[in-house]
């Protein structure tokens, strides 16, 4: 049996959102992540704890969170998978459902299958 990604669609969505909001990786406040995702601050706080336990996020003082080196590499890799999944799924899904479908697909597939979706 092939191993699938250990990241959930929600984990991936948070990593990619953090990457997009904090391009220089100086740290981002949880309230900014909550606003971008339409989530509550407690939900974001819980996810930051989860991602920190996985080694993807470092929680800093004053509610700042930054992607670790591993988090940056993972977010970069998954951003390519996400873009490829969106290209693949766009004909079958409305704009409203496309993001959810893309995150679900990349969370469900093993990484070698995701790599085959990415050109070059």
Task: Give, region by region, the residue ranges found by the protein language model.
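Short alpha-helical segments that sit at the start of domains
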Residues: 1-15
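Short acidic, hydrophobic short linear motifs in intrinsically disordered regions
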Residues: 24-34
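Key DNA-contact positions within bacterial/archaeal DNA-binding proteins
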Residues: 42-45
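Short, hydrophobic-biased segments on the C-terminal half of alpha helices
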Residues: 48-49
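A short, conserved structural fragment
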Residues: 52-62
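Basic, amphipathic "hinge/linker" alpha-helix immediately C-terminal to the N-terminal HTH DNA-binding motif
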Residues: 63-81
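Amphipathic alpha-helical dimerization/coiled-coil segments
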Residues: 83-120
